[in-house]
Amino acid sequence: MIYVSGALSMWGDRMWHFAISVFLIELYGRNLLLTAIFGLVVAGSVLLLGALIGDWVDRNPRNKVAHASLLVQNISVTVCSIVLMLVFLYKQWIESIWDGWLTVVCYTVVIVLADVANLASTALTIAIQRDWIVVITGYNRGHLAGMNATMRRIDQVTNILAPLAVGQVMTLASNVIGCGFILGWNLVSLIVEFIFLSRVYRIVPALSVKPPVPEDGQASLERPAERTEGLVERRGSQGQCPARAPGGCCYGDLTCKDGWRAYYRQDVFLAGMGLAFLYTTVLGFDCITTGYAYTQGISGSLLSLLMGVSAITGLMGTVMFTKLRKAYGLVNTGIISSCLHLCCLLLCVCSVFAPGSPMDLRLLMPFLDANANSTLVEPLLPDRSSIHWTNNTVLFENMPSGMEPDSYISIILLFLGVITARIGLWSFDLTVTQLLQENICESERGVVNGVQSSMNYLMDLLHFIMVISAPQPQHFGILVIISVLFITTGHTMYFLYARKAKRKPAGLWPSAKVQEQTRTQVN
């Protein structure tokens, strides 16, 4: 039931994130401005509120957190879909009211509701995938690894199929029908997920037992030197989590500070930071890389095929994770995954200097070449007037003649590296995810994972800033090299964590009996 609930939630999220981007483009005259604003608002809100969301997850019963997050998320998407339907149906009439300011109000409402839905989705992800499944597996590391891998496989499949499904509806019908489809899906999904999560909560009694968050004056601060990897030591006689700020007028500021401090003092801090650094990259199947591929003559159908292959390699990474963890242990699995990831990315570095690469350093220093300004350059993200949507695929119309690359070796090496690297990437991601689950005090899981989400969004913002600073295809090689440097830094942080972790005696998760005794002490 937890898998079905997770699949429905992920499917709805993937459909919505794809559709809202297309809707905003269509609403603003096929311009990327609204989409860019939406992206910044979403990233900024999670960055600022991640710790608060996590703290809210920690302080409230598990069933109330899951139900509230689910309701807020689906209701926000439903209302937003209704607003979008009205805007699409009566756009000309709305634009004529208040000299067009009603249109601005509608755009603002859409972006705010979509952002609220994303925040609720973040809370639900932290609650279910970072806390619930740990308890459901009975604190069994093998079962936890299998459950994490299965959830990630579901995520990989929905990442491909969900946008394709809603894209077909929008293409064959209309944007209004697409909004209606998403609206209906969310209402049905809300009911099913609510029932399934409630049933899981009743079936697993341990979910109803949750240690309270220590307040100032109720728990002594735990010194970093006294922290160990095992949950037994952490929850033993001196295993209470550090105190957190109580509610009050300065609750938000104190919670954010306490959340970041809690994140910093975790034993797995370097591993979490290493994972966050992997978000600063253009080496993925996002709008940046696909835009670059189009400028290099890659057709939309071929790109869709490559995305499908990348999903398969991602699934291979989840399978490899479970086998490596069983054979070599969790920490060593991260080391092997890191090495595999970096080795595959060397192909991307080679693509920068291979035949067919458009990299031209003179564009960064035009004063060295008087003719640099006369060089024809294309932005990584083309104007939407030159493209159209067809079955979730963007196809170029009327590509300038003579702009085809001399050789496709560079682009082949690039995508070969990106696709194969996903095996190590997803195995590493699962490794760090489980390390966070195993090594974070139960009453701090929410706030620490909330800060981790904030870090991920922060590093993701940096890669967009990189593209804004160097937006031409001729700059893409520089972005590739910078991305590999960030990824290398992230894996280096993990290597430092692994070295430190291996010097400590391995901690054991408590048995059900010890777990119950510990919770009795906390309560």
Place the predicted regions along the sequence by residue.
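Juxtamembrane intracellular "pre-TM" segments in multi-pass secondary transporters
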Residues: M1, R199-G274, T295, V394-M403, ...
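Substrate-agnostic recognition of the 12-TM MFS/MFS-like secondary transporter fold
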Residues: M1-I20, F38-S76, L102-T171, I182-S198, ...
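Primarily residues marking transmembrane-helix entry/exit sites
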Residues: I2-Y3, L32, T103-I111, G248-C256, ...
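Short amphipathic helix-loop junctions that connect adjacent transmembrane helices
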Residues: F18-L33, V134-V135, G284-L303
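Transmembrane alpha-helix termini and helix-breaking/packing motifs in multi-pass membrane transporters
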Residues: S21-Y28, S81, M85-I94, I160-N186, ...
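Membrane-helix interface/capping residues of multi-pass secondary transporters
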Residues: L32, R62-N63, S174-N175, G300, ...
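C-terminal ends and interior cores of transmembrane alpha-helices
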Residues: L71-T103, C339-A370, P382, H388-D406
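Multi-pass alpha-helical transporter architecture, strongest
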Residues: V83-L84, W185-Y201, L345-P355, S483-N523
